[in-house]
Amino acid sequence: RIRNGALEEISPKLVTMMIGTNNLHEDKKAYPPDRPENIFAGIRAIVNEARTRLPKSRIVVFSIFPRKAGPAYERVKAVNALLPQLADGKRVFHVDINSLFLSDKGLLNKSLFDRDLLHLNKQGYLTWATAMKPLLKKHGLRVNPNALGQKD
């Protein structure tokens, strides 16, 4: 999509990305999951394409959100360990807020996810949005004080 015009005629101040999670899906009957280094290579390619097509934009890459314990979560952690390499501190930044989605014991906080334990539910999205408010301010963007129904 990016190469086919999805970013034409726009110039956002900030682009946020949380990508790669769908590449971790495993359907043993159809196909194996992508390897972490291949997922990272895909994320890097998308970030580089966005840098080229949006030369005035800053890009924030979020770590892939945690999963329930198991092989997929091990792959999430492997990809996330590579993501800081993308940050240059000028235009591309890496942000890891995964601790917000974990319990005190380091397990997935199921109350923030839908039944599939992959997609965030309303409370999970509110958690993410709340974490984004200081990030937006840090990058010089104004935040609606009534956003999320909360006052600053």
Predicted regions and their residues:
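Catalytic His-Asp segment of secreted/periplasmic serine-dependent ester chemistry enzymes
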Residues: 66-152
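Oxyanion-hole/transition-state-stabilizing segment in secreted/luminal serine hydrolases
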Residues: 1-40, 60, 64-68
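Loop/turn elements at helix/coil->beta-strand transitions in domains of secreted/extracellular proteins
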Residues: 10-15, 54-58, 89-93
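Active-site segments of SGNH/GDSL-like serine hydrolases
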Residues: 18-24, 47-79, 98-99
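Amphipathic, non-transmembrane alpha-helical secondary structure
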Residues: 2-4, 37-44, 48, 126, ...
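Charged helix-capping and loop-helix junction motifs
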Residues: 33-44, 75-80
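N-terminal cationic-hydrophobic initiation segments that often serve targeting/anchoring roles
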Residues: 6, 47, 51, 84-87
